[in-house]
């Protein structure tokens, strides 16, 4: 059976890039590579709400046999 693997097609589909291209993309002088402040603020607020809500629950271990955990 003949191997008909096309490396160029694979690179396009897999988004394979060279180290030099990554260095160029991640250069510290790149403008617009990060999130906006509004987006970052929203993510922090949502994360804070989720952490706050889940930390207020009374969690019981799954194997707990105490009355307070069963009811």
From Swiss-Prot:
Q: How is it modified after translation?
A: Contains LL-lanthionine and DL-beta-methyllanthionine, when coepressed in E.coli with the flavecin synthetase FlvM2.
Q: Name one GO molecular function term.
A: signaling receptor binding
Q: Where in the cell is it found?
A: Secreted
Q: Which residues carry this modification: 2,3-didehydroalanine (Ser)?
A: 36
Keywords tagged on the record: Antibiotic, Antimicrobial, Bacteriocin, Lantibiotic, Secreted, Thioether bond
Which residues get removed as pro-piece? 1-33
Q: Name one GO biological process term.
A: killing of cells of another organism
What pairs make up the disulfide bonds?
none
NCBIfam families in the record, alphabetically?
lant_II_LchA2
- Spell out the protein name for this chain: Lantibiotic Flvbeta.c
**Gene that produces this protein:** FlvA2.c
């Amino acid at each position: 059976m003949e191997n008909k693997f096309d490396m160029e097609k694979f690179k396009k589909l897999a988004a394979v890039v060279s180290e030099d291209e990554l260095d160029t993309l991640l250069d510290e002088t790149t403008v617009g590579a990060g999130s906006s402040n509004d987006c970052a603020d929203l993510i922090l607020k949502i994360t804070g709400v989720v952490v706050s809500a889940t930390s207020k629950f009374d969690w019981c271990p799954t194997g707990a046999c105490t009355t307070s955990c069963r009811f």
